[in-house]
């Protein structure tokens, strides 16, 4: 019987990059890996309203670099960069080391509706507001199509609309070639907590095919957003540099 592998893990080093970029000896590897997990849990819990798509962590000597890809960078940066200082202090407290050098970069997601995690988060928020799941899926598909994705698959499982028996419903628009390694597949999962229990959400987004060493370009037919004239924002923290 066939089993579905995680599309992100299958394509690491081909079209996907590692979420943690560092090397460590065997004796310290478990400790650093647990630190990464604590950092991600802290960021996703404290800044749940910031629309954080991914948290990338890199380590260089004694410096820790955290890159946050978000749909709303203003929520993280704050007024005059006050949010960056608060975030750094929170990470240092989470790690139990206030002297740890932490460098934070905030990057704005260019196409919010083409990001699998942000789409899954949108679906979860609507389901928690008791919106009918078929309507939510239809709206999510329309948003993704306006963003110019080449293919999209959405799966929702659980007690849909409060049904007594749990079931799984899914829909697919366009191409989603999961067997093609050069296919740029963005995959995300999310859990929606409702009065009838939890609903599991899975989203696959096909953005095109890319060869190793090439950078994925947005499709030609991608519909621009209302704020398309703005350049993607990137806020780089250099406060720890001398």
Curated annotation (Swiss-Prot):
SMART domains: KH. GO terms for cellular component: cytosolic small ribosomal subunit. Coiled coil: none annotated. It holds the Pfam family Ribosomal_S3_C. Residues 39-110 form the KH type-2 domain. GO terms for molecular function: mRNA binding; rRNA binding; structural constituent of ribosome. GO terms for biological process: translation. Keywords: Ribonucleoprotein, Ribosomal protein, RNA-binding, rRNA-binding. The keyword Ribonucleoprotein applies. The keyword RNA-binding applies. Part of the 30S ribosomal subunit. Forms a tight complex with proteins S10 and S14. Belongs to the universal ribosomal protein uS3 family. NCBIfam families: rpsC_bact (TIGR01009). Binds the lower part of the 30S subunit head. Binds mRNA in the 70S ribosome, positioning it for translation. This is Small ribosomal subunit protein uS3. It comes from Synechococcus sp. (strain RCC307).
């Amino acid at each position: 019987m066939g089993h579905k592998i995680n599309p992100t893990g299958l394509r690491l080093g081909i079209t996907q990059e590692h979420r943690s970029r560092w090397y460590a000896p065997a004796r310290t590897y478990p400790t650093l890996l647990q630190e990464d997990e604590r950092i991600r849990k802290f960021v996703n819990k404290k800044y749940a309203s910031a629309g954080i798509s991914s948290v990338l962590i890199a380590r260089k000597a004694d410096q820790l670099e955290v890159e946050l890809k978000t749909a709303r960078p203003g929520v993280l940066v704050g007024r005059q960069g006050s949010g960056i200082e608060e975030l750094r202090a929170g990470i240092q407290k989470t790690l139990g080391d206030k002297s740890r050098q932490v460098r934070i970069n905030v990057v704005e997601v260019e196409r919010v509706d083409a990001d699998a995690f942000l789409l899954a988060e949108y679906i979860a928020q609507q389901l928690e507001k008791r919106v009918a799941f078929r309507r939510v899926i239809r709206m999510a598909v329309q948003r993704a199509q306006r963003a110019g994705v080449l293919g999209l698959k959405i799966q929702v499982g659980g007690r849909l609309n409060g049904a007594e028996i749990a079931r799984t419903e899914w829909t697919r628009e366009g191409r989603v070639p999961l067997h093609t390694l050069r296919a740029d597949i963005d995959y995300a999962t999310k859990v929606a907590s409702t009065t009838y229990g939890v609903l599991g959400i899975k989203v696959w987004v096909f953005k095109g095919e890319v060869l190793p060493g090439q950078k994925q370009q947005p499709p030609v037919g991608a519909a621009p957003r209302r704020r398309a004239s703005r350049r993607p924002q990137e806020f780089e923290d250099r406060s720890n540099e001398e």
